[in-house]
Amino acid sequence: MKPMKPTTLALTTTAALSAFSLQAWQTVAYARNSLSDAPPAPPNILLIVADDHGLDALGCYGNPVIRTPNLDALARDGTRFTNAFCTTASCSPSRSVILTGQHNHRNGMYGLQHDEHHFQCFDTVRSLPVMLADAGYRTARVGKFHIAPESVFAFQTVLSKGAANDPATIGRSPVEMAELSRPTIESADPRPFFLYFATDDPHRSNAFTPDGTTTFDTYPNPNPFGNRPAGYPGITPVVYNPADVIVPPFLPDTPAARAELAQYYQAVSRLDQGVGHLIDILKRAGKYDNTLIIYISDNGIAFPGAKTTTYDPGLQLPCIIRAPARRHPGAIQDAMISWADLTPTILDVANDTPPDAAARFDGRSFRAGLDGEKLTGFDEIYASHTFHEIQMYYPMRVVRTRQYKLIHNLAWPLTYPFALDLLQSPTWISATKTNHGEYFGKRTIAAFLHRPEYELYDIQRDPGELHNLAADPAFAAVKNGLIEKLKLFQQRTKDPWFSKWSYE
């Protein structure tokens, strides 16, 4: 075989390279087209759940006194929801809804998860961490858990354990929680992560009597809300003057209430610093832009008139969401969403909506509104409360629209029961010792403890929910229409208490 001439060799080589380049370009172009047609890669998911953080104590929600610079910055970079509601103002039941998309009367978490209560979800329930793990996510949790059984709410990695409201738990030290989360965030594992970051703050802190009994009794001193002289690693305490705090309208403006609100504010500011440290870790790892960040609370502020009630201070909560590829930072979303919608939304963002989602979940995805876009059909929410502690049986079912709220007190002849942390709060104790024990804020103590079967409020005209319209003939049509909505809700969500309609 004759050797090729240099010119021939050059031409042949050029042709071969051109052919290779064309093939390579076609391959890359095809890959690009294929990628553009495919759904985006699922993002990391960071779900931050505070404990008893009401709408009343965040700068971005209008409080000019509280210092929450990190959560305010997250709101400026994401979307702030103004009509977000938990479905029950009680810790374990609310968390079960957050992580299943089912109301607690359906998933079985009727009340608080403690050994003496034995409330837990049904074994057949599939939770968010399990579904995300099946979809290829790395799942981890840190901080407060307070739901059961662990087999239903299984996380691949448990970064910390601690009893609920344990004074020594890691859930009071949010910077340490963030540091424990660092390996999960910084891992080189190509799989996305789901991190459940649940603080004990700003829940009231408890102590133990010599015989080991839990107590919240600090009267006449305010509950410390987890604040302690020794402080916490990485935290710069922000101390508030009781004279400066803003007393919510449903609370009495008393020295006791102000002293406790000052402690509550300090716990919120500590929580905010932990969130800031966590987000800084995300940014330094280069994963902030590809992480869905959700900040919520399980229920409202731990004061009588909010927590464990179905009044708005217990149900209407902060919700700040920063979605990857957001186009409108600082957006405001006024759609009415509830915590039953969170699991369907997160799975939708993760491209893992199950085919039976409509039947499996009591909520629905609001992914289309994560960037502040107008959502249609999100104009009412439902709430369902049955127990808090085991002795606190007081089932309530609620429908709230933009104008009206109907509360059905199913066991209305009973005296409204008190959670231990609220009963022993100096704010409540001092109110019962003043004004002849007649008023708690603008509501009479008698009205707080003894409620009628139905409560109907015009939220727009009566945001304090003080004037019950249920017995007013002028509102009979409104009341009856909302009752029918409640019945359909209970049927649809398989509420065992629906049977009371037939025999009472």
Task: Identify the residue ranges that each predicted region occupies.
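Bacterial N-terminal signal peptides that target proteins for export
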Residues: 2-14
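Catalytic-site neighborhoods of secreted/periplasmic enzymes
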Residues: 97-195, 201-208
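Short, structured active-site-proximal loop/turn typified by the sulfatase FGly-forming signature C/S-X-P-X-R
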Residues: 63-95, 101-105, 129, 133-140, ...
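Aromatic-lined glycan-binding groove of carbohydrate-active enzymes
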Residues: 395-410
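C-terminal segment of classical bacterial N-terminal signal peptides
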Residues: 17-27
